[in-house]
Amino acid sequence: MAPKAEKKPASKAPAEKKPAAKKTASSDSKKRTKTRKETYSSYIYKVLKQTHPDTGISQKAMSIMNSFVNDIFERVASEASKLAAYNKKSTISAREIQTAVRLILPGELAKHAVSEATRTITKYSSAAN
């Protein structure tokens, strides 16, 4: 027997082949479930229909709007998290969210966002009781 050469780093060797398991009728009939992708599409569509009932929206525009909502959500959440950390609090409250919105959105847009949020929360609270 010849002397063995130095060992090289293991490369991706194929795994040992095992005899194939027999497929049963039940495993063939199972369908793969689609992975769910959560979007704001239905909510964006509802708001669109409230404001402009006769207007539609394309898939591309809906994708852009979804990205926009995700981006704003991340910005507000990140800013609120920083504010909570500055104040040595471990919980993000409505106050941190409101302050984050005021810091992120410019001028009139922030004022309208805060007033709409306050109005909506009041409406929700009164409906829950």
Curated annotation (Swiss-Prot):
Residue segments, region Disordered: 1-37
Comp. bias regions, Basic and acidic residues: 1-19
SUPFAM superfamilies: Histone-fold (SSF47113)
Post-translational modification: Monoubiquitinated by the UBC2-BRE1 complex to form H2BK123ub1. H2BK123ub1 gives a specific tag for epigenetic transcriptional activation and is also prerequisite for H3K4me and H3K79me formation. H2BK123ub1 also modulates the formation of double-strand breaks during meiosis and is a prerequisite for DNA-damage checkpoint activation.
Organism name: Meyerozyma guilliermondii (strain ATCC 6260 / CBS 566 / DSM 6381 / JCM 1539 / NBRC 10279 / NRRL Y-324)
Source species taxonomy: Eukaryota, Fungi, Dikarya, Ascomycota, Saccharomycotina
InterPro entries: Histone-fold (IPR009072), Histone_H2A/H2B/H3 (IPR007125), Histone_H2B (IPR000558)
Subcellular location(s) per record: Nucleus; Chromosome
Keywords assigned by UniProt, alphabetized: Acetylation, Chromosome, DNA-binding, Isopeptide bond, Nucleosome core, Nucleus, Phosphoprotein, Ubl conjugation
Subunit and interaction comment: The nucleosome is a histone octamer containing two molecules each of H2A, H2B, H3 and H4 assembled in one H3-H4 heterotetramer and two H2A-H2B heterodimers. The octamer wraps approximately 147 bp of DNA.
Residues recorded with modification Phosphoserine: S11
The keyword Nucleus belongs to this UniProt entry's keyword annotation: yes
Record-given protein name: Histone H2B.2
The keyword DNA-binding is annotated on this UniProt entry: yes
Function recorded in the entry: Core component of nucleosome. Nucleosomes wrap and compact DNA into chromatin, limiting DNA accessibility to the cellular machineries which require DNA as a template. Histones thereby play a central role in transcription regulation, DNA repair, DNA replication and chromosomal stability. DNA accessibility is regulated via a complex set of post-translational modifications of histones, also called histone code, and nucleosome remodeling.
Residues with N6-acetyllysine modification: K7, K8, K12, K17
